[in-house]
A protein has these predicted regions:
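Periplasmic c-type cytochrome electron-transfer domains
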Residues: 4-28, 32-35, 39, 43-298
Length: 298
């Protein structure tokens, strides 16, 4: 591959080629795009890699017939610069399969080409997928999504088999037998039993949840993709994975913006800092996602 900026300038010689030493890199330096490490336990534990499908892998399963690895996760579009260009479309929820059948699928095909959806269509989206499990025949895969509070059923290649099934707040864990799917709703502390034939919840078992009310209420603002995005598929946690980070850099400036004066005293009682805050510049430049853990009082 080549290292090209968004103006079409090729920097490969300076990144990985003969001039790489100028930036402290060895010739041949590269960034790997490995989504999964595949360990062959029948062949001296040899390790191979598959990738190129997504930025963050959030769940993995193995197809019961072919042995193909299948992953679910998030593909982020951080290569697109500037907030007005992105217009809120900065990530996609995906399923990828490698091996005998290779495919990469957008699990929300109804969102393609649009920046906003009415509530009824938004409810069909899945966001922040966390668990995937195949049926014993391999014809179905069930996907539990933490941000959209639902379960989606797809075929072996990731194509939807109907609309998502609402199951509970924070759907994180999943297990199947031939008759039902068991879904752990982490945020509300319940286990939902879903009838696989009827595609609806048949029973809910409450679990003990010691988390304080303040944390439970805050989870909706952090994770809920239907509540806080125009297409129903992203939330704060799309980039701040589990309140941490996606380890990506984003250039979210606004070339058409203006300086925003900050008229407060920011020296915190230290004269060397000066009396004023620096004004906010509309061009932030590339900035890496920061963790939100220990944000208050630490």
């Amino acid at each position: 591959g080549r290292w090209v900026d968004d103006n079409g300038t090729d920097w490969s010689d300076f990144v990985s080629g003969p001039q790489a030493w100028r930036s402290g890199r060895p010739t041949g330096w590269n960034l790997l795009d490995h989504d999964l490490a595949v360990v062959d336990t029948f062949n001296n534990n040899q390790v191979s890699y598959v990738g190129g499908a997504m930025s963050v892998v959030t769940g993995v399963a193995v197809h019961p017939n072919s042995g193909d690895p299948v992953a679910i996760g998030i593909e982020s579009f951080n290569e697109i610069r500037f907030e007005p260009v992105l217009e809120g479309v900065f990530a996609e929820v995906r399923l990828a399969r490698w091996g005998s059948e290779e495919t990469v699928v957008n699990l929300n095909p109804h969102t393609e080409g649009v920046h906003t959806l009415p509530p009824a269509e938004r409810a069909k989206s899945v966001g922040d997928p966390r668990a995937i499990a195949f049926s014993s025949t391999g014809e179905e895969a069930w996907i539990a999504s933490k941000g959209s509070n639902n379960v989606l059923v797809v075929d072996a290649l990731g194509q939807r088999l109907g609309d998502p099934i609402p199951v509970g707040f924070g759907s994180t864990g999943l297990a199947l037998n031939d008759d039902v799917a068991f879904v752990h709703n982490h945020f509300e502390g319940t286990l939902a039993v879903v009838d696989r034939a009827e595609r609806e919840v048949s029973a809910v078992v409450s679990l003990f949840d010691p988390v304080p009310d303040e944390v439970q209420q805050g989870r909706a603002h952090m994770y809920d993709t239907h509540l806080h995005s125009a297409r129903g598929e992203v939330s704060c946690a799309t980039c701040h994975i589990d309140s941490r980070m996606d380890r990506l850099a984003w250039d979210l400036g606004n070339p058409g913006g203006s300086m925003q004066p900050i008229d407060v005293n920011c020296n915190m009682g230290v004269e060397q800092f000066g009396p004023d805050c620096p004004d906010f510049h509309p061009m932030k430049g590339p900035m890496t996602t920061q963790t939100m853990q220990d944000l208050i009082g630490k």
